[in-house]
Amino acid sequence: QLNAPALLAELTGIDVVADFRSRDVAAGGQGAPLVPPFHAAMFGGDAPRAVLNLGGIANLTLLAPDQAPRGFDTGPANVLLDAWCQRHTGQPFDADGRWAASGRVDGALLQALIAGEPWLQSPPPKSTGRDLFNMTWLDARLAGWKDKTPADVQATLQRFTAQTVADALDAALPQAVEVLVCGGGARNAGLMRDLADALRRPVRATDEAGVAAQWMEALAFAWLAQMHVDGLKAGVPEVTGARGPRVLGALYPA
């Protein structure tokens, strides 16, 4: 995404594989998410489960026996939590959800946030980003809730992340027996508690399944790069909406 693979190859003297999204987009897909086939390779098995990545945006990979993996974004993960925390505390993130824990979830505000965003109601495959879920979006939706304390809003935003994930999983793979969590949000103890409460099934970090949560994305793209080098198709049309699987990425030799 930095779009400097030729420069990287020149400076490092190492073959570089990059630009994984373009071929999927050319085939009619959304170009994201791209990690579900790696999740399937690592965590697929004889029981239905989900893998939840909590970066700025939350995305789910659905793994069911004898089925192609499916995946899609569910809404904001850390993007709103971090921005609201930065504005009101000066800290870049809410460590372990401690600030959120000092507030109270407002049920009416939570429902207003969910019901007021059409994207949340749209069916998969779908993806989103900071172009939609940002402080402009949040400020517009808080305009009628000026009486809420910043800590109460933080608590409600944390539950908003958990509830939108739970709603998406219940609609797409209700038989999932567990949820494995990766990304920065897996280190937020408060968010993990909210997820366990909303999902009503075991929730654990991918560390417990053998893959460090903070390295998941890096490992996934290393895997995608190797798939390209081997000439293997890694795109999953059930995930991105493309017309078919494609070999993803472009090689920039050293």
Where are these regions (language model features)?
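Short beta-strand-loop/turn "lid" adjacent to the catalytic site in phosphate-handling enzymes
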Residues: 1-2
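Acidic-glycine-rich active-site phosphate/pyrophosphate-binding loop
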Residues: 10-14, 56, 132-140, 190-201
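Conserved ATP-utilizing enzyme core subdomain
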Residues: 70-162, 166, 244-254
